[in-house]
Swiss-Prot record:
A.terreus has been used for the industrial production of itaconic acid because of its high production rate. Itaconic acid is used as a monomer to form polymers that are widely used as raw materials for latex, synthetic resins, adhesives, paint, and additives for acrylic resin fibers and paper. It is also used as an acidulant and for the pH adjustment of foods. The keyword Isomerase does not apply. Pfam families: MmgE_PrpD_C, MmgE_PrpD_N. Its main location: mitochondrion. It is an enzyme of class 4 (lyase). This is Cis-aconitate decarboxylase. The gene is cad1. GO terms for molecular function: aconitate decarboxylase activity; protein homodimerization activity.
Length: 490
């Protein structure tokens, strides 16, 4: 028997272990505060889906998809229409990611809700078509499996390393998270869960060059949701894949996505299962307050602090006195966002990914929300924003690479024409040092959801999600999510 054959029969690897954990996870295994937190993460994902459903690039995605996809049984959030499960999952994921307001992980960058919720919702509707009822606790358990597995698999390949090398990391290690969440919802055995994982992992991909223009970055986490859902549904139907996909020495997920990274060891297999059942990544999923890449939230918060400290100095009327803005970033942030836009007009997605443009709009508007990146009325062509963006110089600081939770850190120094300067450092932005309070997430939900639908529906969804653990059938929730919404930009 060859070594590879022996490996294929082994049941002791980390793939088997995390699949066994996911398949057998029960409510009693999970602390009550984790169960409660999961509901608020679901609520945040729903808010982002609603507010993202009718922005121009989402409408274009729906228009293109509807032109070739037949109707199906799975609801499209905010449109009153249905598609097949794979198409619905991709579409709903594109909505959650559409505005850069959705959650992120500060050590292993990915956007969990945009992967987990679309896959789990679609899988639940597949089961409903078969006459099966899915409860709220079924959804919570599946979501927690996704919330817990994505960051662990990401950390096994050094979190942001993929991002530094040009991969859209969340689209890569989000695929197995989507498969595990889907598999949990479908009730897969540990063996079938491994099949789902293998099918998802062999499709994993995502190029970060998508950040420089176009619309496709908005749906790349949708590829992960699709891959995970497809893996789960095929495994549910008895389709088989390789076992031990994560740790295989030839063609395995961890091996292939760490080639050439210069690390020793190149990957940390043990991270896949580290702290399962005792440490909960559900609490390390970060909530965004700014509509831009999470890796630059530290610099944005630093500018905010300076604006509060020096209101006259940084008043909009006095911004012409700024000679230069220096910003120091972590390796991940500098690789991803430390670039100066050269082409005008900039696209919305490029604006949300460029630290120079992001800090410029924060200085001009004293906020960094969806409106700052709207493509309407020449908003992205404002001369005062461009003048400031070209005064920003990003650089790397090794100081921010020492702690995985400092990937979003930033030090900003603003230099004025008279030679004076002001400086502020934020190592861990709000929600990183300590989890964002649930009450703050609820406020964000109400604000975003209230901008696109009526108050009564906002309240209905809120009540259903926050009592999800007591909901015997999630159909009423999915029906409400399907109701048409309006654009937040008009």
């Amino acid at each position: 028997m060859t070594k590879q054959s022996a490996d294929s029969n082994a049941k002791s690897g980390v793939t088997a272990e995390i699949c066994h954990w996911a398949s057998n996870l029960a409510t009693d295994d999970i602390p009550s505060d984790v169960l409660e937190r999961a509901k608020y993460l679901i609520l945040d994902g729903i808010a982002c889906a609603w507010v993202g459903a009718r922005v121009p690039w989402s409408e274009k995605y729906v228009q293109a998809t509807m032109s070739f996809e037949p109707p199906g049984a799975c609801r499209v959030i905010g449109y009153g229409q249905k598609l097949g499960p794979v198409a619905a999952a991709m579409t709903n994921s594109a909505f959650i990611q559409a505005t850069e307001l959705d959650d992120y992980h500060s050590e292993a960058p990915l956007h969990s809700a945009s992967i987990v919720l679309p896959a789990v919702f679609a899988a639940s509707e597949v089961l409903a078509e078969q006459g099966k009822t899915i409860s709220g606790i079924d959804v919570i358990l599946a979501a927690i499996v996704g919330f817990e597995s994505g960051p662990r698999i990401g950390k096994a390949i050094y979190g942001s390393d993929l991002l530094n090398n040009g991969w859209h990391c969340g689209a890569v290690y989000g695929a197995p998270a989507g498969a595990l969440a889907t598999g949990k919802l479908l009730g897969l055995t540990p063996d079938s869960m491994e099949d789902a994982l293998g099918i998802a992992c062999t499709q994993a991909c995502g190029l970060m060059s998508a950040q420089y223009g176009g619309m496709v970055k908005r749906v790349q986490h949708g590829f992960a949701a699709r891959n995970g859902l497809l893996g789960g549904l095929l495994a549910y139907g008895g389709y088989e894949a390789m076992k031990g996909v994560l740790e295989r020495s030839y063609g395995g997920f961890l091996k292939m996505f760490t080639k050439g990274n210069g690390r020793e060891p190149p990957y940390k297999e043990e991270e896949v299962v580290a702290g399962l059942g005792s440490f909960w990544h559900t609490f390390t999923i970060r909530i965004k307050l700014y509509a831009c890449c999470g890796l630059v939230h530290g610099p944005v918060e630093a500018i905010e602090k300076l604006q509060r400290r020096y209101p006259e100095l940084l008043n909009r009327a006095n911004l012409s006195n700024i000679r230069h803005v220096y910003v120091q970033l972590s390796t991940a942030s500098n690789s991803h966002c430390g670039w100066i836009p050269e082409e005008r007009p900039i696209s919305s997605i490029a604006g949300q990914m460029s630290v120079a443009y992001i800090l410029a709009v924060q200085l001009v508007d004293q906020q960094c929300l969806l409106a700052q990146f709207s493509e309407f009325d020449d908003n992205l062509e404002r001369p005062e924003v461009w003048d400031l963006a070209r005064k920003v110089t990003p650089s790397h600081s090794e100081e921010f690479d020492q702690d995985g939770n400092c990937l979003s850190a930033g030090r900003v120094r603003i230099e004025f024409n008279d030679g004076s300067s002001v400086t502020e450092t934020v190592e861990k932005p709000l929600g990183v040092k300590e989890p964002m309070p649930n009450e703050r997430i609820l406020h964000k939900y109400r604000t975003l959801a209230g901008s696109v639908t009526d108050e009564s529906r906002v309240k209905e969804i809120e009540d259903l999600v926050l009592s999800l653990d007591r909901l015997t059938d999630i159909t009423p929730l999915l029906e409400l999510l399907n109701c048409p919404v309006k654009s937040p930009l008009v």
